[in-house]
Curated annotation (Swiss-Prot):
NADP(+) binds at I31, D85, R201, V233. Pathway: Mycotoxin biosynthesis. Trichothecenes are sesquiterpenoid toxins that act by inhibiting protein biosynthesis. The gene is SAT2. Its EC number is 1.-.-.-. Belongs to the short-chain dehydrogenases/reductases (SDR) family. Short-chain dehydrogenase/reductase; part of the satratoxin SC1 cluster involved in the biosynthesis of satratoxins, trichothecene mycotoxins that are associated with human food poisonings. Satratoxins are suggested to be made by products of multiple gene clusters (SC1, SC2 and SC3) that encode 21 proteins in all, including polyketide synthases, acetyltransferases, and other enzymes expected to modify the trichothecene skeleton. SC1 encodes 10 proteins, SAT1 to SAT10. This is Short-chain dehydrogenase/reductase SAT2. It comes from Stachybotrys chartarum (strain CBS 109288 / IBT 7711).
């Protein structure tokens, strides 16, 4: 597990390379906003080398985040992309199209239109009431899985245009993929009779592992894909939980605060994921070597595998997530086919409505 000192030192090197264009889905609050401030702080003296698209629902909060970040990093370019509900694939498509439009019409410094970093932190309360979107997806499953894969696929033209290795980061439950039995194959929608936030986590983390590995293979040397568990981070998410949870959390907070991650540290860890330590598959671009004891291992247990599942300090959780007893020759294809079929079906239906 890298220390915060190691993490900060690595992040401090980000401005030394070429300029960075980033997009943060869910960047108006919580972890997304902590990351935004970490990027602004990192580029405090190099503002002209940073452009960030903040995607979210609340324009007021976005204005506050952007104002604070511009003060921290004078000269940096911050843009708000409004999305009413990122559980909807149509809103993901709309947001992605707007990013592509703006980046194509006015590429950063007149350089090639591209996206170097894509962070996805958008979420809904995991203990809230089950809700089905107008597109037919469970809102929780969509927010933490389907909409995130859609973001990646829609923004691939910009991501693969990056002169760097583009980094894609999904913040949810990396390293928490354990609990899958050898005879289980949690691919598809969570059946109603076993629906629970733990079951949703099992299905979505299982599929995400295999789809990220598939993308890492398809876009070797171009994409690094990371699924991370941020730890217990104090923020507005707790106020959106059911009343019983808020009361319990208030009573337990003096104790839980001992285990909480500070917002500044969380933001710095998120920024650390943009460094070359998390390399694409087959990339030799400043990639760590297997002799590096702190080198992150991919979900396949190798250094530089391109698809990573990490704990709250960006530490590899390989033994838990390799699914050695669950991997079959067609597991990856099943996860990929289900995901693409689901997204394509929704896109076709949306096209007939538009």
């Amino acid at each position: 597990m890298p220390s915060l000192q190691v993490i900060r030192a690595a992040v401090a090197e980000l401005p030394q390379g070429s300029s960075i264009v980033a997009a943060v889905a869910g960047g108006t609050t919580g972890i997304g906003s902590y990351l935004a401030k970490a990027l602004a702080t990192t580029f405090a003296s190099h503002g002209s080398k940073l452009r960030v698209y903040i995607v979210g629902r609340n324009a007021g909060r976005a204005k506050t985040v952007i104002s604070e970040c511009q003060k921290i990093s004078p000269g940096s370019d911050w843009r708000f992309i409004h999305a009413t509900d990122l559980a909807l694939i149509s809103e993901v498509d709309k947001s992605s199209a707007e990013i592509i439009k703006q980046e194509t019409e006015a590429p950063f410094h007149g350089e090639l239109a591209r996206l170097d970093l894509l962070y996805m932190t958008h979420a809904i309360p995991i203990l809230g009431h089950k809700r089905t979107t107008e597109e037919g997806l469970d809102a929780l499953e969509s927010t933490i899985y389907y909409s995130r894969i859609r973001f990646i696929l829609q923004l691939l033209p910009l991501l693969t245009a990056s002169p760097r290795v583009a980094h894609v980061i999904s913040v949810y439950a990396g390293g928490m993929e354990n609990g899958v039995k050898p005879d289980e194959e949690p691919i598809g929608f969570v059946p109603a009779e076993i629906y629970h936030f733990n079951t949703v986590r099992k299905y979505t983390t299982f599929m995400k592992t295999f789809v990220f590995e598939e993308l890492a293979e398809k876009y070797a040397e171009r994409l690094s894909l990371i699924h991370i568990y941020p730890g217990l981070v104090d923020g507005p998410g707790f106020t959106q939980m059911p009343r019983w949870f808020r009361v319990l959390f208030t009573l337990m907070k003096p104790l839980t605060s001992l285990y909480m991650t500070r917002s500044e540290d969380c933001g710095m860890v998120m920024a650390y994921l943009a460094t070359s330590r998390f390399s694409a598959k087959g990339s030799g671009q400043d990639a760590p070597t297997s002799t590096d004891t702190l080198a992150p291992k991919s979900s396949l247990g190798v250094v530089g595998g391109g698809a990573y599942s990490l704990g709250q300090r960006a530490d590899s959780q390989t033994p838990q997530i390799m699914f050695e007893k669950s991997r079959k020759p067609d597991t990856s294809k099943k996860a990929w086919d289900h995901t693409i079929r689901t997204l394509d079906d929704i896109a076709k239906k949306n096209a007939t409505i538009a």
